[in-house]
Design a protein with these regions (language model features):
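Glycine-rich, charged/polar anion/phosphate-binding loops
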Residues: 114, 154-155, 167-168, 178-181, ...
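Glycine-centered tight beta-turn/hairpin loop motif at sheet-sheet or coil-to-beta transitions
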Residues: 176, 251, 475-481, 500-504, ...
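Structured core elements
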Residues: 20, 49, 126, 139-140, ...
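Acidic, low-complexity mobile loops and tails
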Residues: 551-567
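Catalytic cores of soluble metabolic enzymes centered on carboxylation/carboxyl-transfer
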Residues: 267-503
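N-terminal beta-alpha lobe that positions the nucleotide/phosphoryl donor
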Residues: 1-244, 248-265
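Structured, non-catalytic alpha/beta "coupling" segments that mediate domain-domain communication
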Residues: 47, 56-64, 305, 404, ...
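Conserved nucleotide-binding/hydrolysis modules and their immediate coupling elements
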Residues: 487-527, 535
């Protein structure tokens, strides 16, 4: 089923049968219980999978599905109610003897009572909306002079966003790690855990990079956390997939919340366990049980996932909408994406472009592969957080796991600052070589033309050799132009590039696979991706993505060729 805004979305194009359930805004489509039920009935469905968001944790929706004679692929409505309210979820954890963060018992909605209890607890204190989830509805109080303002703001947000003014008051753990346990239950008391994930890298309580297993923590501690997660699930005869989230600080762990649905980050668990979690979800819904026991499960290697978003880090990560005129994602890893090149990122829904999931024998290798993969992501038409993710993947503190849930927020300027190029001369010279060699080659054999970059153009005058001292003017993204002269030392292999300043570089350049180049300078080798697209040269380098606009002097073009618009 889909909204009008998603009528041409990838998931609609791929499916055999689809039903439109309303207008673009979620409140007029994906959140309309009656419309979803009617759509399912119209195609004779016997079950509904709620996905990640929208109605996935709504007990009224689960009841409506069952009342219509269909299977709700998730927990029972009663379980959703229990965990949908943070106060009752915390009570369930206490009843199961799972450690919880100290604070006032139960929810509070009276501002004066909240202020008095906060003062008794001592700052810092976290105010949490009882109906919140997924990192939303949390406000940290650190200064008593703003206490009243913070309380009133938290109450307003809880009411407007979650429909309830109830707040939980909890002691704030300033440098905690976020560890969550994936559980699966058959609804009859049999619950297993699929080990843990570490989701410590967050921005304003929103997960950015997730990994499994949790690195650098004692396995005995992680086993205790997993055992408590299973016990909590068993007390409620948990059905389906769910995630029990914890904070870990100072060798202790504390219950945070339960997400009673499949999570965005489930692929890292699939990678280390070898299980298909969606298939397991369907098996449970069919009443076939889990089909496995705890001893069947083992950890294989390390997996890391990064969420690539259409958002602008320079504008406080505001969503960026538009058409994906270019979308090039790397190979050699798992990519989960709901869009393709040419699709639109709309203002209606979460602006995620893709999830990049790397699985490797160890964490060090996984992080290195993730960073390399991010280097080779190319997106045009919208702003993205690619550079931000790359900076995280290569950060030494993160590599040593010397991070906590507020670590990103404290280093945001550093992580989002555009890095200066250390070798702009090298990349400009590389662009000149690639342009000259490609424009002189047979375009039918040119891998770039296979990407429809030059429809209607005839490039080159034929022949393999480059004329001595061929010139090309390159204009960078700052509109700074420079004329370079490319001379062959060994045609097809090594070149001398002279700049306007009289400086010279000797580089080797060889295409390994279509669009993938090996560029050498002395004993140093760089691997880059390159293409000529819409009249510009795009380079994906170890220092980021660079764009140059080339122009070759007409003096090098004969009259017939010029008339034919050859370059």
């Amino acid at each position: 089923m889909h909204s009008q805004a998603d009528a041409n979305a990838l998931h609609v194009r791929e499916i055999g049968k689809s039903v439109c359930i309303g207008a673009g805004p979620a409140s007029e489509s994906y959140l309309k219980i009656d419309a979803v039920i009617a759509a399912a009935q119209s195609v004779g469905a016997d079950a509904i999978h709620p996905g990640y968001g929208f109605l996935a944790e709504n007990p009224d929706f689960a009841r409506a599905v069952e009342a219509a004679g269909m299977i709700f692929m998730g927990p029972t409505p009663e379980t959703l109610e229990r965990f949908g309210d943070k106060a009752s979820a915390k009570e369930a954890a206490v009843a199961a003897s799972v450690p919880v963060i100290s604070g006032a018992e139960g929810a509070r909605s009276d501002p004066e009572q909240i202020a008095e209890e906060v003062r008794q607890m001592g700052l810092p204190v976290l105010l949490k909306a009882v109906g919140g989830g997924g990192g939303r509805g949390q406000r940290l109080v650190t200064d008593e002079t703003t206490l009243v303002e913070d309380i009133e703001g938290a109450l307003r947000e809880a009411k407007s966003t979650f429909g309830s003014e109830g707040l939980l008051l909890e002691r704030f753990l300033p440098e905690a790690r976020h560890v969550e346990v994936q559980i699966a239950g058959d609804g009859k008391g049999h619950v297993v855990h699929l080990f843990e994930r570490d989701c410590t890298l967050q921005r304003r309580h929103q997960k950015v990079i997730e990994e499994a297993p949790a690195w650098g923590l004692p396995r005995t501690l992680l086993d205790d956390i997993a055992r408590d997660a299973v016990r909590l699930g068993e007390t409620l005869d948990y059905r389906g997939l769910g995630t029990v989230e914890f904070l870990v600080a100072g060798g202790e762990y504390f219950f945070l919340e339960v997400n009673p649905r499949i999570q965005v980050e489930h692929p890292v668990t699939e990678a280390i366990t070898g299980l298909d979690l969606v298939a397991l979800h369907l098996r449970i819904a069919e009443g076939a049980g889990l089909g496995l026991v705890q001893d069947d499960l083992t950890i294989n290697g390390h997996a890391v996932e990064a969420r690539l978003y259409a958002e602008d880090p320079a504008m406080q990560f505001a969503p960026s909408t538009g058409t994906l005129s270019t979308l090039s994602l790397p190979s050699g890893l798992r990519i989960d994406s709901g869009v393709e090149e040419g699709d639109a990122v709309t203002p209606y829904y979460d602006p995620m472009i893709a999830k990049l999931i790397v699985h490797a024998p160890d964490r060090e290798t996984a992080l290195a592969r993730l960073a390399t993969a991010l280097d080779h992501v190319a997106v045009e038409g919208v702003e993205t957080n690619r550079a931000f993710l790359t900076a995280l993947a290569r950060n030494h503190e993160f590599e040593r796991m010397q991070v906590h849930t507020r670590w990103i927020d404290g280093r945001l300027d550093e992580l989002t600052q555009a890095p200066g190029l250390t070798r702009p001369d090298l990349w400009k010279a590389t662009a000149a070589i690639l342009f000259v060699t490609q424009s002189r080659s047979d375009t039918n054999a040119n891998p770039w033309t296979n990407r429809d970059a030059f429809t209607g153009w005839r490039l080159g005058l034929g022949g393999d050799a480059i004329e001595a001292g061929q010139r090309v003017t390159l204009t960078d993204s700052d509109e700074v132009s420079e004329e370079l002269r490319v001379s062959p030392v060994k045609p097809g292999a090594k070149y001398t590039i002279h700049s306007e300043k009289g400086e010279a570089l000797i580089l080797s350049a060889r295409e390994l696979t279509p669009g993938r180049w090996r560029v050498g300078e002395g004993d140093t080798v760089h691997l880059i991706d390159a293409r000529l697209h819409a009249g510009v040269i795009e380079l994906d380098t170890p220092e980021g993505r660079l764009v140059f606009r080339p122009a070759a002097p007409l003096a090098f073009v004969g009259g017939d060729a010029a008339a034919d618009r050859a370059v």
